[in-house]
Amino acid sequence: MARNKIALIGAGQIGGTLALLAGLKDLGDVVLFDIVDGVPQGKALDIAEAAPVEGFDARYAGASDYAAIKDADVVIVTAGVPRKPGMSRDDLIGINLKVMQAVGEGIKTHAPNAFVICITNPLDAMVWALQKFSGVPTNKIVGMAGVLDSARFRHFLAEEFKVSVEDVTAFVLGGHGDDMVPLTRYSTVAGVPLTDLVKLGWTTQEKLDAMVERTRKGGGEIVNLLKTGSAFYAPAASAIAMAESYLRDKKRVLPCAAYLDGQYGVKGMFIGVPIVIGANGVERVLEVTFDDAEKAMFDKSVASVTGLIEACKGVDSNLA
């Protein structure tokens, strides 16, 4: 049986972490691509030399030619400029849109049948542009956002309640920015909603609100601490969970930036919503009901993404 092939576009901090995790989880063979020649080859060799110690048999290759991603089953895109202190995700549009064009052409030529996961920021706009540039069917391309944002929320909740992260479920929807929507009503500890835990005295509404706000600012918190880049361990782990659900047909329900065609009242955009990822890519969009406050937050988040997409169209008229 042929082994899966995973192509990683961008051999920076996230790309290298993705490559290692793909091997540790035995997801397939890995091609690391980067335009800076030597970097993908060096990281690929370094991780390949870790394989005998960790006991996995994935084959690794590094490349600076898109031909190397030929017939990849999964393509994960991290290429682009990361955030630096003081930058918003939106500040990255001009630079990273050009990167998405080059990546999109590479995917269209060499791996048109791949399941594509975009991590590049500003996420919701970049996955939209990448789909346009690559021509990949909308059910075969998603953005990594909600899994990461939900993981951050779960971590904060587990710390507050002093329980295992395994027993904490959290859903963060909307755009991957400061207007994201952490849904406390749909978030639970061992099936008990957070709203009930407040009533039971496990925490206070003020503490819960603070955790929601910290989740929204989670990426910026790490950017400010690192000072030279942005998060990479948790984003990589999140994308690997998505890739694994596709490659192994696990049909996990994961919050991702997915193409909406009328669901949630949104059409023609990628927005963070719960989806089922299986062998056919995005197999289902789960539509949850909002109360008035949640609907207002979600609509505000969608408006922010709409603004980013309009900005993209302003930069590249071919996207209009």
Swiss-Prot record:
GO biological process terms held by the UniProt record: lactate metabolic process; tricarboxylic acid cycle
UniProt keyword list: NAD, Oxidoreductase, Tricarboxylic acid cycle
EC number: 1.1.1.37
SUPFAM superfamilies in the cross-refs: LDH C-terminal domain-like (SSF56327), NAD(P)-binding Rossmann-fold domains (SSF51735)
Keyword tRNA processing listed: no
Class of enzymatic activity (EC top level): oxidoreductase
Binding residues annotated for substrate, in chain numbering: R83, R89, N121, R152
Stored Pfam families: Ldh_1_C, Ldh_1_N
Binding site for NAD(+): G10, A11, G12, Q13, I14, G15, D34, N96, I119, T120, N121
CDD domains from the UniProt entry: LDH-like_MDH (cd01339)
Presence of keyword Nucleotidyltransferase: no
Molecular functions per Gene Ontology: L-lactate dehydrogenase activity; L-malate dehydrogenase (NAD+) activity
Reaction equations catalysed: (S)-malate + NAD(+) = oxaloacetate + NADH + H(+)
Transmembrane segments: none
Residues forming the catalytic site: H176 (proton acceptor)
PANTHER family per UniProt: L-2-HYDROXYCARBOXYLATE DEHYDROGENASE (NAD(P)(+)) (PTHR43128), L-LACTATE DEHYDROGENASE (PTHR43128:SF16)
Family: Belongs to the LDH/MDH superfamily. MDH type 3 family.
Role this protein plays: Catalyzes the reversible oxidation of malate to oxaloacetate.
Protein name: Malate dehydrogenase
